[in-house]
Design a protein with these regions (language model features):
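Conserved phosphate- and dinucleotide-binding cores of soluble alpha/beta proteins
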Residues: 2-23, 30, 45, 127-259
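HTH-adjacent hinge/linker in prokaryotic transcriptional regulators
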Residues: 2-23, 27-97, 101, 108-116, ...
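Gly/Ser/Thr-rich loops at beta-strand to alpha-helix junctions
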Residues: 102-104, 235
């Protein structure tokens, strides 16, 4: 097996399991532990995984955000409920921003009947999903493509966002601590902040597992959003700081509480 094929196969293992040991990878691919370490070093340098004691992980940490393919497999039912609720906030004729996240990306499958509609996004999955949808005008934000996030970021993206004004922005973040949102990646933070500035109304969509976490970069206070949408699974402990601060928290279950 060629080194590049083996590294892709290592990523496939991590996408499925989240973590893997050097010993297991060595046995699986029939190579030395030293070779596995070199593969993991290269993949870590590319920002695709993080090395941990005895192996590697693709799971999030305060400094590392998971690959989008792994995140898409997590809390899928909850994310779908949140996305369906968010779609109910959109009216025909509006313009909306959708960020790069897997939670907001799920909105794309819920808005095909809301027409006409302008969707502006740096999320390649959303662009691909809606590119042929009748009555939906898709504006793709350019920039440097990130394989890890499956989205576009950087100077070109930021300049485009600075020139836009939209009705609604739907964003997510990888960590909520107290009444603030955080993220691991600096360029992602910059794009999200500009999306907040570009919108009349803004909603943060996060599954309940994002609460009680922190990450390297402060994104914004939650009071920047008209509401925070999450699953009914969110604990009272994590909901309390938002409610005490007067931040609108919508717990979405099958009854779809109104925002």
């Amino acid at each position: 097996m060629k080194p590049e094929d083996r590294r892709q196969a290592i990523m496939d293992v991590l996408m499925e399991a989240g973590t893997a040991s050097v010993e297991d990878l060595s046995l699986r691919f029939g190579v030395s532990k030293m070779t596995v370490h070199r593969d993991l070093d290269d993949l870590e340098q590319a920002g695709l995984l993080r090395k941990v004691h005895g192996g590697a992980s693709i799971q999030s940490s305060p400094q590392f955000e998971s690959d989008f393919r792994y995140r898409e497999k997590i809390a899928t039912a909850e994310k779908r409920r949140i996305a369906e609720h968010a779609a109910g906030l959109i009216e025909p004729g509006q313009s909306i921003l959708i960020d790069d996240s897997s939670t907001t990306g799920a909105i794309a499958d819920c808005i095909r009947d809301i027409r006409p509609l302008t969707v502006i996004t740096n999320n390649l999955g959303v662009i691909t999903s809606l590119s042929g949808a009748a009555g939906i005008n898709v504006i793709a934000l350019g920039g440097q493509y990130s394989k890890k996030f499956n989205g576009f970021f950087g100077i070109v993206t930021d300049e485009a966002l600075r020139s836009l004004r939209v009705d609604i922005a739907f964003l997510s973040s990888s960590a909520i601590e107290g009444t603030a949102a955080f993220h691991q990646d600096q360029e992602v933070v910059q794009a999200k902040r500009l999306m907040v500035k570009a919108a009349k109304r803004k909603y943060l969509l996060v599954d309940h597992d994002k609460f009680g976490r922190s990450a390297l970069h402060f994104l914004t206070g939650l009071d920047a959003f008209d509401a925070v949408l999450t699953g009914a699974e969110v604990s009272a402990e994590h909901a309390a700081p938002l409610e005490e601060a007067g931040i609108r928290l919508v717990r979405v279950d099958n009854r779809k509480e109104k925002a």
